[in-house]
């Protein structure tokens, strides 16, 4: 094992991580916190022992492993070879059953290569389609169906969904995806196109957040409006943006968490933007 790999005891098991390649997440573990705990709670509400869960961009398994304990069948995609090795070790260490596939996922089958987006954050690697050592597949080719998917593929979300047309039509899965304005631009995938993809197939979009300590789903009438109000600098000036998650739920499907209206969602978004600005000013003054 590399000297830079360290194992942490977490609420969801023993997890190893490369403390150099994944310095950002390692610091979260060092503080005794769990990376994406809210995401685990959110997805767990949609999964049961009959569900097929897909983790697209599984990284070291922070979502894969706790969800595998609840889902009937779990499939994890991780394109980066070194990260996938750690993922497999973490799965074995925690004695959960996961079908691990060292492949990239996209709109069509082919080849590609891994490119680093941010140093010290291996989870932020992206996939460049073309020539390379990475096998790229579509989910329609790979799978018969799935019920719930988490998608964190650094700007390739729209491409992956276009390769999932049949499953979207036949199985009507719930999809949690990350919105990263910077990476969407890098992959020439407009946010409004991602929004239209889901709404055009009969999906409602929600922004997950905490209200009075409770996890809720905020109705999102427009992803562009949410992004504009949350990160105006990234939206208008192409600055590097932070990310936020959106969950797409088929219309008519029961939602297992409280839903709040659009005005409450926007109230939260504007307050979050203001809090981040105040935080930056305080950091500068101190």
What would you call each of these model-derived segments?
Residues 1-90, 96-99, 125, 129, ...:
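S-adenosyl-L-methionine
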Residues 4-5, 70-71, 141-255:
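Conserved acidic-Pro-Pro-aromatic motif
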Residues 10-12, 107, 118:
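A generic beta-sheet turn/junction motif
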Residues 28-52, 100, 109-113, 120-171, ...:
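Short internal loop-to-helix segment that lines adenine-nucleotide cofactor pockets
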Residues 57, 104, 152:
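The conserved acidic donor/metal-binding loop of glycosyltransferases
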Residues 82, 106, 156:
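Conserved Rossmann-like nucleotide-cofactor binding loop
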Residues 100-103, 177:
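Short loop/edge segments at beta-strand edges and connector loops
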Residues 105, 109, 179:
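Short beta-strand-to-loop element that shapes/binds the nucleotide-sugar donor at the catalytic cleft/hinge
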């Amino acid at each position: 094992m590399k000297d830079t790999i360290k194992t942490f005891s977490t609420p969801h098991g023993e997890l190893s991580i490369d403390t150099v390649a994944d310095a950002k997440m390692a610091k979260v573990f060092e503080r005794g916190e769990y990376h994406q705990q809210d995401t685990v709670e959110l997805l767990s509400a949609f999964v049961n022992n009959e569900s097929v869960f897909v983790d697209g961009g599984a990284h070291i398994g922070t979502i894969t492993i706790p969800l595998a304990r609840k889902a009937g069948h779990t499939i994890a995609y991780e394109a980066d070879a070194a990260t996938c090795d750690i993922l497999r070790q973490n799965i074995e260490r925690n004695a959960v059953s996961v079908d691990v596939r060292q492949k990239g996922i996209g709109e069509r089958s082919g080849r590609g290569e891994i490119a680093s987006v941010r140093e010290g954050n291996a989870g932020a690697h992206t996939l460049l389609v073309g020539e390379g050592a990475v096998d790229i597949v579509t989910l329609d080719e790979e799978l018969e169906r799935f019920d719930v998917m988490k998608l964190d593929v650094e700007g390739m979300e729209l491409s992956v969904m276009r390769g999932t047309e049949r499953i979207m039509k036949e199985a009507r899965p719930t999809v949690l995806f990350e919105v990263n304005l910077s990476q969407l631009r890098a992959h020439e995938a407009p946010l409004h196109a991602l929004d239209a993809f889901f709404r055009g197939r009969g999906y409602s979009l929600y922004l997950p957040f905490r209200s009075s300590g409770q996890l809720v789903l905020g109705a999102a009438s427009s992803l562009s409006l949410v992004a504009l109000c949350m990160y105006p600098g990234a939206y208008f000036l192409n600055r590097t943006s932070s990310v936020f998650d959106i969950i797409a739920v088929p219309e008519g499907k029961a939602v297992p968490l409280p839903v709040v209206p659009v005005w409450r969602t926007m109230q939260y978004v504007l307050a979050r933007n203001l809090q981040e600005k105040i935080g930056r000013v305080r950091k500068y003054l101190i």
